[in-house]
């Protein structure tokens, strides 16, 4: 993980899991995190319309140029939704430094994939290290392994394990 991102994530810990996930996704400068940023809608590698820091959905307005503030608002809304979607399925106490990377992960792969994952089963069995290690398995999109997803999962895994050290 780049030192600047490590420092920014460490600074976000006091803000909780959503703050940690937000910094992971946006990076220290707002456009150098795990998602990058595009203010103009585009189709991602699997053909899904996407804007800002990876926001998807029917509310994307094609042809619109989004502002930095609009992108931040979309990310905050999306991460709050992720938290509501997955928190009920996590049955054990986990540190915010584990929960934050899980929010980032679910923001990327979707709550449905998380709910049926070995990763969640390991969390609920108390095997946090095993759960964090499972992140390494989620590096494919459209049937192809992507270096960017490999890098993302390594960073999410590293932060996920912070509470275990």
Curated annotation (Swiss-Prot):
Its EC number is 3.2.1.17. Signal-arrest-release (SAR) endolysin with lysozyme activity that degrades host peptidoglycans and participates with the pinholin and spanin proteins in the sequential events which lead to programmed host cell lysis releasing the mature viral particles. Once the pinholin has permeabilized the host cell membrane, the SAR-endolysin is released into the periplasm where it breaks down the peptidoglycan layer. Its main location: host cell. It is found in: Host cell inner membrane. InterPro entries: Bacteriophage_GH24, Endolysin_T4_type, Glyco_hydro_24, Lysozyme-like_dom_sf, Lysozyme_dom_sf, SAR_endolysin-like. Keywords: Antimicrobial, Bacteriolytic enzyme, Cytolysis, Glycosidase, Host cell inner membrane, Host cell lysis by virus, Host cell membrane, Host membrane, Hydrolase, Membrane, Signal-anchor, Transmembrane, Transmembrane helix, Viral release from host cell. It comes from Enterobacteria phage PA-2 (Bacteriophage PA-2). Pfam families: Phage_lysozyme. This is SAR-endolysin. One of its GO terms (cellular component) is membrane. GO terms for molecular function: lysozyme activity. PANTHER family: LYSOZYME RRRD-RELATED (PTHR38107:SF3), PTHR38107. It catalyses: Hydrolysis of (1->4)-beta-linkages between N-acetylmuramic acid and N-acetyl-D-glucosamine residues in a peptidoglycan and between N-acetyl-D-glucosamine residues in chitodextrins. Belongs to the glycosyl hydrolase 24 family. The keyword Acyltransferase does not apply. The signal-anchor, which may also be an uncleaved signal sequence tethers the SAR-endolysin to the membrane until the latter is depolarized by the holin, resulting in the escape of SAR-endolysin from the membrane. GO terms for biological process: cell wall macromolecule catabolic process; defense response to bacterium; killing of cells of another organism; peptidoglycan catabolic process. It is a single-pass type II membrane protein. The chain crosses the membrane at residues 8-28. The keyword Membrane applies.
């Amino acid at each position: 993980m780049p030192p600047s991102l490590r420092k920014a994530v460490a600074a976000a810990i006091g803000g909780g899991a959503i703050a940690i996930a937000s910094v992971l996704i946006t990076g220290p400068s707002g456009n150098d995190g795990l998602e990058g940023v595009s203010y103009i809608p585009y189709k991602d590698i699997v053909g899904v319309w996407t804007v800002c820091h990876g926001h998807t959905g029917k509310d994307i307005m094609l042809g619109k140029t989004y502002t930095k503030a609009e992108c931040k608002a979309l990310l905050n809304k999306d991460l709050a939704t992720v938290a509501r979607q997955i928190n009920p399925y996590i049955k054990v106490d986990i540190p915010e430094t584990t929960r934050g990377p899980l929010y980032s992960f679910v923001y990327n792969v979707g709550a449905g994939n998380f709910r049926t994952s070995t990763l969640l089963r390991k969390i609920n069995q108390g095997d946090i290290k095993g759960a964090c290690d499972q992140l390494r398995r989620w590096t494919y999109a459209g049937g192809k392994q992507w270096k960017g997803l490999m890098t993302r999962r390594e960073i999410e895994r590293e932060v996920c394990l912070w509470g275990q050290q």
